[in-house]
């Protein structure tokens, strides 16, 4: 029997009278759920624990959701994550303040906030052109250096080695591999020198990310917050290194986002939290 799963695109409802952003998550639809819904591909909503979840299962529906900025707000969801992970209110207010159309740095013809521009900047990094070509070359070079027996044998998850090969748990190895790949390609090797254990800590956090998404209380989520805080702490150390010493090996997106944040006066602690979400976006999809 085939296993069906879909990403659930989430947003926060702006229903009248509701001030608190509603929590959104990415979930897998199991076979049982699909059978219950009779394999319908129509979008639907679920209300659980006082929260409304909007579920879409088709790419064309996802595009419509992203365009629907009147009733669905991804900014509310993102700001909620920023608070949960340590950004203070002043930083959030600064990042989501409307910027002039003639600002320096990344073009802002529609006069949007940096919080909104960040999404456009990430898309710009992946547009066909010099930035994408540079990223692709780095990925190819990284794979060429690391996809060999010597490197695989040194993998933390390698469990048995012999004269003819090495045994690794596939899921664990793929997760470690793609997290390290995304980190090195976007942030350069300086971050690994600062904290060689960062990918391992992030993987622990990633396995428990649902506790962050569902806003578990501190006393029930220390196993998630401890590795998360380690990752954020390492990112703070990374951005305390002069940019000239790391910019040559990092992606355009990372350097440009840092420049935009510093131009607004965002301090190192808040910068690290913002970049934690960018780190999350860069490595979580390949490793999931």
Q: PLM features: residue spans?
A:
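Structured alpha-helical bundle/scaffold domains in large eukaryotic membrane-trafficking regulators
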Residues: 96, 155, 190-198, 243-254
